[in-house]
């Protein structure tokens, strides 16, 4: 499981608020947070870069720990 929700909560933001920053619908962010959908590498990088710009100090590995994808495949 990824740590998007944990990072979002640390910022004190709702899913709706963070989704707006990305220009996404709240449901897309929810799907990523719950693991219903897996973000591609580009989306993962965008998420981490944005979290850092918003004041979090995180890395790709801290938000998306290695082995996060249940089937073991890297998404792109």
Region spans (language model):
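Short alpha-helical DNA-recognition segment
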Residues: 12-31
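A short, Lys/Arg-rich alpha-helix, primarily the initiator
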Residues: 1-10, 58
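Residue-level detection of the helix-turn-helix DNA-binding "recognition helix"
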Residues: 5, 9, 23, 34-36
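The alpha-helix within a helix-turn-helix
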Residues: 8, 19, 48
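Residues that mark the N-terminal boundary/hinge immediately upstream of a DNA-recognition element
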Residues: 3, 14, 40-43
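DNA major-groove recognition helix of helix-turn-helix
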Residues: 33, 43, 51
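Residue-level recognition of specific faces of alpha-helices
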Residues: 3, 28-31, 47, 62
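Short, charged recognition helix plus adjacent turn
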Residues: 37, 41, 49, 56-76
């Amino acid at each position: 499981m990824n740590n998007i929700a944990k990072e979002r909560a640390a910022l004190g933001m709702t899913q709706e608020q963070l989704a707006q920053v990305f220009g996404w619908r709240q449901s897309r962010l929810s799907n990523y947070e719950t693991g219903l959908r897996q973000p591609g590498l580009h989306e993962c990088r965008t998420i981490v870069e944005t979290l850092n710009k918003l004041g979090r100090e995180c890395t790709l590995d801290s938000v998306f720990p290695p082995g996060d994808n249940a089937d073991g495949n890297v998404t792109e």
